């Protein structure tokens, strides 16, 4: 496939990277929920899952393990909503024969696959493409940015939890963004409080406000906080649309606020 990268992204209006300095902070959760929120706002959305060693988004969207087909323009993405075709996804999970198979690859092979993902997926018309990256700053991140140079990247959303150990890692992620001239669209504090499944009261089981404080210290925008909600966790495990199922929840309000803030900043 000799896609140029730019050709298959020509009809993509906005590209957002979702980054985290540390694993386990819920980066893929935020990516998934933002994609669903954008779709509910009437946008056509794509997710490029380049977390090669831990591709979890196909399960969160309950797309199973479909075959990836090719057309004249390249790989055809998988749709989480085959009828409406408003939410497209491409992930290495679709290319593995066994879902339990470990991806034990050296940097050059990872870089080559990411290059294919960026250049050879026939997204068609998209309002927003979300790129879900692995934690840290690695070959994968550099490969994504290098392959997206021909296309304008709007910026990055950084995900952290409230604890100092997580915000410390995000500081390094901010340094990475500055060194690579990647605009920071804002910081999301995930797992900010725990929503009781019985009374819906939110209690702080971790420290609180670390993400907002980090945003102030680094001059970044603070997009908002998302609580640790058992209903959200259950929805992701079952591949259900949390935003559609629980529109009365405070977590719905938090995610919708973050999504709307991003849409406004993009003028999307």
Curated annotation (Swiss-Prot):
Example GO biological process: iron-sulfur cluster assembly
Molecular function GO terms recorded: 4 iron, 4 sulfur cluster binding; ATP binding; ATP-dependent FeS chaperone activity; iron-sulfur cluster binding; metal ion binding
Annotated Pfam families: ParA
InterPro entries according to UniProt: Mrp/NBP35_ATP-bd, NUBP2/Cfd1_eukaryotes, P-loop_NTPase, YlxH/NBP35
Compartment(s) of residence: Cytoplasm
Known cofactor(s): [4Fe-4S] cluster
GO cellular component terms given for this protein: cytosol
Cofactor stoichiometry and binding remark: Binds 4 [4Fe-4S] clusters per heterotetramer. Contains two stable clusters in the N-termini of nubp1 and two labile, bridging clusters between subunits of the nubp1-nubp2 heterotetramer.
The organism's place on the tree of life at top rank: Eukaryota
Record's keyword terms, sorted: 4Fe-4S, ATP-binding, Cytoplasm, Iron, Iron-sulfur, Metal-binding, Nucleotide-binding
Disulfide-bonded cysteines: none
Chain residues that bind ATP: 21-28
UniProt-annotated binding residues for [4Fe-4S] cluster: 196, 199
TM ranges: none
Family (UniProt): Belongs to the Mrp/NBP35 ATP-binding proteins family. NUBP2/CFD1 subfamily.
Free-text function comment from the UniProt entry: Component of the cytosolic iron-sulfur (Fe/S) protein assembly (CIA) machinery. Required for maturation of extramitochondrial Fe-S proteins. The nubp1-nubp2 heterotetramer forms a Fe-S scaffold complex, mediating the de novo assembly of an Fe-S cluster and its transfer to target apoproteins.
Name of the protein this chain belongs to: Cytosolic Fe-S cluster assembly factor nubp2
Organism: Danio rerio
């Amino acid at each position: 496939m000799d896609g140029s990268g730019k050709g298959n992204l020509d009809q993509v209006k906005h590209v957002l990277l979702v980054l985290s300095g540390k694993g386990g902070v819920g980066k893929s959760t935020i990516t998934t929920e933002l994609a669903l929120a954008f779709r509910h706002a009437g946008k056509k959305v794509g997710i490029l899952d380049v977390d090669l060693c831990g591709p979890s988004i196909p399960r969160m969207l309950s797309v199973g393990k479909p075959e990836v087909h090719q057309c004249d323009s390249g790989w055809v993405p998988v749709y989480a909503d085959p009828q409406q075709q408003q939410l497209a996804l491409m992930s290495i999970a679709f290319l593995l024969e066994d879902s339990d198979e470990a991806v034990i690859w050296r940097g050059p092979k990872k870089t080559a696959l990411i290059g294919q993902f960026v250049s050879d997926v026939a997204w068609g018309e998209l309002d927003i493409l979300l790129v879900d990256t692995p934690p840290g700053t690695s070959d994968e991140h550099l490969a994504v940015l290098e392959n997206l140079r021909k296309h304008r990247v709007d910026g990055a959303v950084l995900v952290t939890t409230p604890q100092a150990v997580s915000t410390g890692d995000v500081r390094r992620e901010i340094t990475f963004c500055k060194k690579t001239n990647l605009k920071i669209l804002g910081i999301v504090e995930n797992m900010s409080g725990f929503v009781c499944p019985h009374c819906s009261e939110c209690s702080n089981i971790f420290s609180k406000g670390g993400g907002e404080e980090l945003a102030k210290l680094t001059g970044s925008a603070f997009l908002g906080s998302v609580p640790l909600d058992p209903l959200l966790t259950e929805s992701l495990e079952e591949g259900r649309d949390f935003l559609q199922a629980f529109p009365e929840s405070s977590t719905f309000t938090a995610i919708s606020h973050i999504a709307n803030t991003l849409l406004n900043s993009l003028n999307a």
